[in-house]
């Protein structure tokens, strides 16, 4: 089905990456609710202290072409696979994954000389991720903005998309 692109749409959703990472780390596939796999990944990450985490957070590769920035997660997945083969615990892998996302957000902000990150999407309901972003924002003197009047999850994504289009139109 995937080879023929049947019921296998392309996606850029960070939520799907959280799901994939949770399954890769051993989530059993029985989801009791939307986001269940991602919530398990968050709980595994939160159960591990920074001192227990072997090595650095995973690396992402950024490619810019034609004014678009592509975030290549393949090197990160290779490193996760290496950790799994070495027997690194799923909690440590989950923590390194979360910390890599925090680093990625600020690497992108730095690349574009941004002093504010506007967060939206269901993955920002993840307290562990938000705490990491808040800590890094303070040390980097960067402001974080979260939705106040619209939901942070998928219900609010369209507003962010509309704002991006308006900004693009205004130049």
PLM feature segments, named:
Residues 24-28, 124-125, 149-151, 164:
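Short, glycine-/Ser/Thr-/acidic-enriched flexible segments
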Residues 105, 122, 159:
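Hydrophobic, well-ordered secondary-structure elements that form the walls
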Residues 14, 84, 121, 148-149:
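Fold-independent oxyanion-binding glycine-rich loops
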Residues 108-115, 120, 136-143, 162-169:
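Hydrophobic alpha-helical segments
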Residues 1-116, 128-138:
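A contiguous, well-structured pocket-lining segment that forms one wall/lid of small-molecule binding clefts
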Residues 98-99, 145-171:
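Glycine-rich phosphate-binding/hydrolytic loop that grips phosphoryl groups
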Residues 118-120, 127, 133-157:
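Conserved phosphate-binding/catalytic loops in two-lobed NTP-binding clefts
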């Amino acid at each position: 089905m995937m080879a023929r692109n049947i019921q296998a749409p392309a996606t850029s959703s960070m939520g799907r990456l959280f799901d994939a990472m949770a399954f890769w780390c051993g989530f059993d596939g029985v989801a009791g609710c939307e986001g269940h796999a991602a919530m398990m990944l968050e709980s595994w990450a939160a159960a591990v202290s920074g001192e227990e985490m072997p090595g650095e957070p995973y690396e992402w590769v950024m490619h810019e072409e034609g004014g678009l920035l592509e975030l290549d997660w393949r090197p990160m997945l290779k490193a996760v696979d290496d950790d799994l083969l070495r027997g690194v615990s799923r909690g440590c892998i989950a923590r390194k994954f979360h910390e890599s996302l925090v680093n990625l957000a600020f690497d992108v902000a730095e690349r574009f000389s941004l002093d504010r990150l506007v967060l939206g999407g269901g993955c920002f309901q993840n307290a562990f991720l938000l705490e990491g972003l808040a800590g890094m924002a303070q040390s980097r003197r960067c402001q974080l903005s979260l939705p106040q009047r619209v939901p942070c999850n998928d219900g609010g994504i369209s507003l962010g998309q509309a704002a991006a289009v308006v900004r693009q139109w205004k130049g």
